[in-house]
Amino acid sequence: VPVGGTAADCESAELSLAYFSEGDVARLAYFRNLSALDITAADVSPALFESIRSAYPALSVRWSIPIGESRYPSDAESITLTDFAVSDLPLFDYFTALRAADARDCTCYDAILSLRGKYPALELQWKVPLGGAEYLQDAADIAVDEVSLTPDALRTALRYLPAAQTVSFPDCPWSEEEKTALRGEFPNISFRWSVELFGTSYPSDTAELSFAGRPITAEDLSELGERLSSFSALERVDLVDTGVALEDMLPLCKAYPAVDFA
C-alpha cells in the first residue's frame, strides 16, 4: 500500500514514516493490523495529528511536536527548549510523558512563567541574566555589584526570579525614591544596600542607629523621617542629647510605631 511517500505491507502492525500528508490519513485504513505509527521524522502539524487521532482513536501515534522553531518527540520525558511563545503553550498538552523541560537557553521569560503556571508539576529550569551574573529560577540570594545597573533592569530580572528572598547591592547609587519604589513592588524581598544619612552610609538592614550627642536640627529631623523607611530591620534610634524636643518627635514616632526612639 502506498503511504508516506513509500510502500508498506498492508499486514504491518507498526509503521515508521519520514513523510506523512493529509492524503495518507485515509490510506491507513488499509492497514488492518496497524497498532503503532511512528511519524517523528515527518513534518506533521497539530491539525494533521488531530486528523489521525480522530480517524483512528485506538492507534498509538508517536510524532514530533512543533514548539517555537524546534520539534520534540511526543513521548519525550525531558526536553531542552528553544525560545517559544505563550501561544505555543497548548501544544504541551500533546506530550504523553513529559516531566522536565530545560529552558536555560531561552529568553522568552513571559512564556516561561506562563508555562510554569499552566504545568506546575513540570520540572522547569531557566536562568536570568543580571549585571555580569546569571541566576537560576530557584535562586534565593541575589548579589549585585555592577553600579551601572538600572532600577528597571533589576525590576525586570526579579519578576522572573520567583524564589528571590534577598538582594544585596552595597554600592547601589540609586536615589531613595527609586529604592523605595522597588521595595514597594517586591515586599517579600529583603533589599540590602547602603543608606546615606547625615553624610554617613549605613547598611539598609541596620537594626540600631545612634546619633547620641549630635545636635539635630529641624532639617535633620525631616531628613531622618524620610530616610528611616529605607531601613528594613530598624528597631531602635538613639537621639539622646541631640536637642530634639519631645513635641518634635511625635510625628516621627507616629510614622514609625515599631521603632523605639530613645
List each language-model region with its residue ranges.
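N-terminal capping/linker segments that flank leucine-rich repeat
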Residues: 1-262
